[in-house]
UniProtKB/Swiss-Prot annotation:
Name of the protein in question: Autophagy-related protein 8
Modified how: The C-terminal 5 residues of ATG8 are removed by ATG4 to expose Gly-116 at the C-terminus. This Gly-116 forms then a thioester bond with ATG7 (E1-like activating enzyme) before being transferred to ATG3 (the specific E2 conjugating enzyme), in order to be finally amidated with phosphatidylethanolamine. This lipid modification anchors ATG8 to membranes and can be reversed by ATG4, releasing soluble ATG8.
Transmembrane segments: none
Subunit structure: Conjugation to phosphatidylethanolamine (PE) leads to homodimerization. Interacts with ATG1, ATG3, ATG4, ATG7 and ATG12.
Subcellular location: Cytoplasmic vesicle, Cvt vesicle membrane; Cytoplasmic vesicle, Autophagosome membrane; Vacuole membrane
Length: 121
C-alpha cells in the first residue's frame, strides 16, 4: 500500500527525521499511522506518533480508536506490512521486525480486515 506520508516527504528528509527522533528519544518509536485508502472508517487527524517502546499493539490500537473517536461496537484493524500484528506484541519488537529503511514504522488501519493475514507470535 502506498503511503501518503512517503509521497509527501522525500526519503532523505524522512530518514534524517527518524534518526533525530531516535537519538533524542531512544525509548520511543517513530510511527506513521494512515488509513487504508478505500476504508469507510474515519480519517485520523495526526499521522506521526512517538510511541513508548513498551506499549503493546493493543494499547496503540486504543490510542488510535480514541483519536478517530471510534465507538466501542465498531471494529478497527491495524496492519504492519499488510499483516495483523499480535495484540500482545510490544511496539518495540514490531518496530525491529518491520521498520522501514527510512527508520519509521508504517502502520495502516481499516474498519475491515482488508488483507486477511494474521501474524503468529
Amino acid at each position: 500500500m502506498r503511503s501518503k506520508f512517503k509521497d509527501e516527504h522525500p526519503f532523505e528528509k524522512r530518514k534524517a527525521e527518524a534518526e533525530r527522533i531516535r537519538q533524542k528519544y531512544s525509548d520511543r518509536i517513530p510511527v506513521i499511522c494512515e488509513k487504508v485508502e478505500k476504508s469507510d472508517i474515519a480519517t485520523i487527524d495526526k499521522k506521526k506518533y512517538l510511541v513508548p517502546a513498551d506499549l503493546t499493539v493493543g494499547q496503540f490500537v486504543y490510542v488510535i480508536r480514541k483519536r478517530i473517536k471510534l465507538s466501542p461496537e465498531k471494529a478497527i484493524f491495524i496492519f504492519v506490512d499488510e499483516v495483523l500484528p499480535p495484540t500482545a506484541a510490544l511496539m518495540s519488537s514490531i518496530y525491529e521486525e518491520h521498520k522501514d529503511e527510512d527508520g519509521f514504522l508504517y502502520i495502516t488501519y481499516s474498519g475491515e480486515n482488508t488483507f486477511g493475514g494474521f501474524e503468529t507470535a
